Structure formats: structure tokens, C-alpha cells
Amino acid sequence: MEQNAEKRSIVGDDNSTVKRQDTSPSKGIAHIKPEYIVPLKQNENQKVAIYDEEMSSDRMTNEFAGGTNKKNKNGRGKKRGQNKNRDNRQVKEQNVLCPRLIHGDISKCSFGDNCRFVHDINLYLSTKKPEVESNIFPSCPVFNSLGFCPMGFKCRFLSSHLNKEDNILISKKEIDPDAQTIWSVKGEVNHISPERKLDLIKRRFPFTKSNEILEIIDSFQQECRDSMKPEEEVESTPQLKKQDPDVEQPVAPQVEQRNKELSEHRMKQREVYLKYKDTRYFAQEKKPLDLYHKKIVSPLTTVGNLPYRRLMRKLGADVTYSEMALAVPLIQGTNSEWALPKAHTSEFPGFGVQVACSKAWQAAKAAEALANSVSEISEINLNSGCPIDLLYRQGSGSALLDNPARMIRCLNAMNYVSKDIPITVKIRTGTKEGHPIAEGLVKRLVNETDVAAITLHGRSRQQRYTKSADWDYVSQVADTLRSAEADFIETEQGKEGRDSKNRIQFVGNGDVNNFEDWYRYLNGNENIDSVMVARGALIKPWIFEEVESQQYLDKTSTERLDILRDYAQFSMEHWGTDEYGISQCRRFFCEFMSFFHRYVPMGICERYPVKLNERPPNWCGRDELETLMGSTDVNDWIKLSDLFFGKTDENFVFVPKHKSSSYANRDS
């Protein structure tokens, strides 16, 4: 009831609504000062926001994920949902310089004349695209930052680190690309070694710990299945069938051998079960995990890349997470999946890797591969809240909420194999609206797992992101968690299993858009350790600066441009300054802008703060740059990218994830 009253007070009481009904925006519309409202042109539609951002990756979107083109009254297509079949792959160079010659040493290519890449540097330079012309980056930003440009002759800012007379690259540091890997120069960590990746691809990786825990889990499951069968049925199964020595029973040799093997296997399972039945077999000593009052950025697929996380660290974040990685591609050594755990040195400690899986064997092997291949990880997080249809139908993400026993097996398997890395889990209130299950689930997680932290998103899967998060329920679950924890510690297993000083960290998530939200939810219940921010940190990346200062910061357009400059800088250091790297930087810059443009400046608002689900009328900023940054037009986002990456190539393609480009009824 208090939450409803608070909502009414923000919008205004009934009397004020009646008085202003002819002049003020309707409910769900951000209140803009009249002088900044731009009148609609003839035949121009009002902006209508589509706020069902699923943070879903292109690699996981297909026909299962929804998205429709409905017809409106005029019979025209109504742009809704996601662009499922968008193709943002960028055009690569026609003449590709041999990777061994990037830094000019022709002797390093072992293929010689048989190499399929260009070996003539002068020929390559003559066909290379013109250099980037940028007022913000007049010279190579990577060279200026690192004293060395990893892209060498391929750099689009080549003139800033090339001796044109001798055609020799300039370097401020003595760096041997073979002796010192490029990623270490860039300050990046968690790169899997080529040898380890090849072992995964060739299925040579020794999943020793995974095999151990899976054998234990299988024995418990078999014992559970047997306990639910009638005793006669158990005795009649081939592996446990009692033979009467007085009666000859002719059996085919193959069947006899198979029955013998099944019997031996079942007896071994029985021995394993008896050995571990009264123990917390999954318990392992872990590093301490401290999320208490930490400023946490949620895992964000596509937009939560390394440059963005690095930007958030600079702007005050304490904890960041990788984009969601799928367990099976990790186990198979897929390059694109192993790119996700990469992090910048500024992110550790406080960097977590999020994994999605549907079965215990996937969870165990993915966690063991991570624990043995990368070192700068503070936690491994099991994603049990992702609402994407494709993952849900495969049994991953929020589908685990419908099968708590499977989720528990996944968590215990991960805990057993992850060495000293803590295991955490992110969940939702449930899968169906009006049927929350998180309260009962956390009780089981306390008693049956050793998770170090639980993050609860205050929405169900069915709600997605369109309705307000239920923080009353989040607070209720936090109380239930502490009560269950206190009861468990009093039990015999609890006294041995959990240290009462290291309680399970509980983090709330959903609809945090400003420092007032952050402190209201954090201070509203002492059982909540911290608050996680997702979309609020994309729309307003300086949100943690506001949390620190406990005041709203009305960033000017110049200050916001500096934030974009940092993002562009970090992007080029990560993806590179060659043609393909610049194209990637521009693409992810536009992905970032699809949220960043939704910020409504405080100085033009009649009422502040603006809620996440409130959309503004057509507005103009206090200067031209502010207006450009608030544009919903993809072409304006590309125009902003030109400030950092030079004029857009005619072959550059960017299709926004949402057909509305965040707003519907656009003709372009």
C-alpha cells in the first residue's frame, strides 16, 4: 500500500490531475518544461516508448524470441519488439595485411609466398582506406595511451606513429609482440591460452572434478528414483534382480554381461550414496565475497561489454559482470564465448562471470574450465533469471525457476569444481505473474547449497521489463532468507557447513534509476546487502557518482560528450584501430547510444527524477549537442560516432536491436 501511495504522490493527487488535464502530459509521460517541448509537425506521430529491453544477444535471438509487425488503423506496419534477423556484421578489408607483418617484420611469416595475405606493405598502404579525421582524436588514441599501437600498419591513425621517411613504426615502449602478448599491454586479463582452448576444442581437457561431482549427483538421483518405486519393482530391475540358484534361467551372453555391468554400476552408485548422504559433499573452501553496500552493475548482454564496464568502473562502480556466457560453447572452446570472460585490470577484484546452462554437467564443466583457464574472477554467477524465449525453451535461464532441484544440482556442481571462486545465483520472483516462488526457493538454497550470494530481480519472467519491480516482495524474500539462514545455522549441518559471520549476500535488482531509489531500497531493509543497477546505468552511466554524492548531477552536454569520449577511447583500445576494429567500435557505440539517448536532462524537466517507464514528448535540449544526444534517430547516433571514429564508411550497417529504435511509429 505504501508503494501505491508513493506512486500517486509522484504523479499528483486527483485534484491536481483534474486541473492540469488539458495542459500536462498524461500518465507515463515525462513532464518537460513548456519552452523545451517541440510541437509535432503535420503527420508526425508522438514518441511512444518501447521499454521491453531484454538485453538479449544477437547470437540468441531467432524466431522463438517473438517480435511482431502489427498493423495500425491506417494499415501501416507498427514497429514492435526486436529486429530478430538483423545483420550487423561489418565489411572487412579487401586487401588484408599478413598478421605477421602488422609491425613490419617480414621474416616472421612462415608461409612465405604461399601466404594468402598481402606481404607488400607499400601495396597495402596504397589500397588502405583514408585515415580517420577526428577533432576529438586528432592522433591515435591507443598510441597516446599505451605508447604503442597494437594495430601497427593497419591503424587508421597510422600517420601519428609512422616515420614516413623510413616507413618505420614509432613506439614509445620497447615491446616485442611475441614476448609480451598484446592483451597484457592493453591491461586486459582472463585470456585463455591457445593450448587450453585447443584442449577444449579437441575434447582433451581433463574434467576431473566435474566427473567426480557428476558421479555423486547421479548416485543421489538414482537413490531418489529407487525410493519412489515399489520394493518389488526395484528388486525386479535387471541390475538388482535376485537369481534363484535352484532354477536355471537361460540368458543370452550379451544380456548376462549387460546385467552384470548394470548391477556393478548400481552397486557403485549405492556405495557413493552411502558415503556422502550425510555430508555437504559440495562444500569447498572459498574466497570471501563482499557485496555489502557495493555499487553493482548488472550483467548486460551486448551492451555490457568490456569498454562499457571499464567506463562504469571509472564512474564509480565497485562490481561488474561479464556478458552472459553459454555453458556448452565454453566447454567446446568457442572463440566468441571465451571473449566474454575477458576483463580490464580495473575490474578486478569485483569482477564476476555469468554463465547460463540447463543441466548439471554443463554447469560443472563450464565452471571447471573457467576456474582452470582464467584467474581474475571474483565469482561465477549462474543466470537463473534470463527471460529470453530461446533459452527458456532449452531449460536455461529463468526455466531453472520451474525446476529448483535442477538449479540446486547446477549450483552444487559449480561449487565443487570452481576451486576457491565463490558461486552466486541471479533469479527472478518466478516465471508467471502473480505466482512468485522466490521465497520458497531461497529457503532451499540456504539448506541445500553453498551459494555465496543471491540476486533477486523483482519481476517475473512473464513481466519482462514492462511493469514495475516489486520491491516489497524483494524485501520479504530478504527477510525469509535471513530467517532460513538463522534456522539452518542451528542445525548440525549448519554448524559445520556455514560460518555465521559469512552470511549469504542478498542483492536486490529492478527499477533503480537514481540515487534516491538506491538508498531507499538499500536502507529500507537491513537484510538487503546491496542494490544492483541495470538499465539505469546505461541511460545514466554517472548514477554511482550521484550515489556517492547523494545528489542529482545535471550533466551538461559537454560533460556527457566526455563520457562518450571515454567510451570511444576504451573501445578502440579493446577492439583496435584498424578498419574492422573501428567498425566494431562504431557498432557498439550505437548500441550504447540506444540507451544513452533516453536520458532526459534534469534542467528541462518540470518534475524530476524521470522514471524508467516514462517517455518524454518531443523535446529539444539547452544546446544543439544536447538535442543531438537525445535524438531517437539512428542516423543521429551515427553522426555522433563520426565525432570519434571519423566519417562513416558507406558500407557501415547498423540495425538497432529494437524495431522502434527505442521509440515506435518511426517512418525511417
Swiss-Prot record:
Q: What class of enzyme is it?
A: oxidoreductase
The protein's GO terms of the molecular function aspect are: flavin adenine dinucleotide binding; mRNA binding; mRNA dihydrouridine synthase activity; tRNA dihydrouridine synthase activity; tRNA-dihydrouridine47 synthase activity; zinc ion binding
Instruction: Give the main localization category.
Output: cytoplasm
Q: Where is the composition biased (Basic residues)?
A: 70-83
Q: Where in the chain are the C3H1-type zinc fingers?
A: 92-122, 134-164
Map out region (Disordered) in residue numbers: 1-31, 59-92, 227-264
Top-level taxon of origin: Eukaryota
Which GO CC terms are listed, alphabetically? cytoplasm; nuclear periphery; nucleus
Catalytic activity field = 5,6-dihydrouridine(47) in tRNA + NAD(+) = uridine(47) in tRNA + NADH + H(+); 5,6-dihydrouridine(47) in tRNA + NADP(+) = uridine(47) in tRNA + NADPH + H(+); a 5,6-dihydrouridine in mRNA + NAD(+) = a uridine in mRNA + NADH + H(+); a 5,6-dihydrouridine in mRNA + NADP(+) = a uridine in mRNA + NADPH + H(+)
Q: Where does FMN bind?
A: 299-301, 354, 426, 457, 509-511, 534-535
Which cofactor(s) are needed, names only?
A: FMN
Its localization reads:
Cytoplasm; Nucleus
Where is this chain compositionally biased, Basic and acidic residues type? Answer: 1-22
Swiss-Prot/TrEMBL keywords: Cytoplasm, Flavoprotein, FMN, Metal-binding, mRNA processing, NAD, NADP, Nucleus, Oxidoreductase, Repeat, tRNA processing, Zinc, Zinc-finger
Q: Where is the active site?
A: 386 (proton donor)
GO BP terms: mRNA processing; tRNA modification
Q: What is its EC number?
A: 1.3.1.89, 1.3.1.-
InterPro entries in the cross-refs: Aldolase_TIM, DUS-like_FMN-bd, tRNA_hU_synthase_CS, Znf_CCCH
Its biological purpose is as follows: Catalyzes the synthesis of dihydrouridine, a modified base found in the D-loop of most tRNAs. Specifically modifies U47 in cytoplasmic tRNAs. Catalyzes the synthesis of dihydrouridine in some mRNAs, thereby affecting their translation.
Family of the protein in this entry: Belongs to the Dus family. Dus3 subfamily.
The protein here is known as tRNA-dihydrouridine(47) synthase [NAD(P)(+)]
Organism name: Saccharomyces cerevisiae (strain ATCC 204508 / S288c)
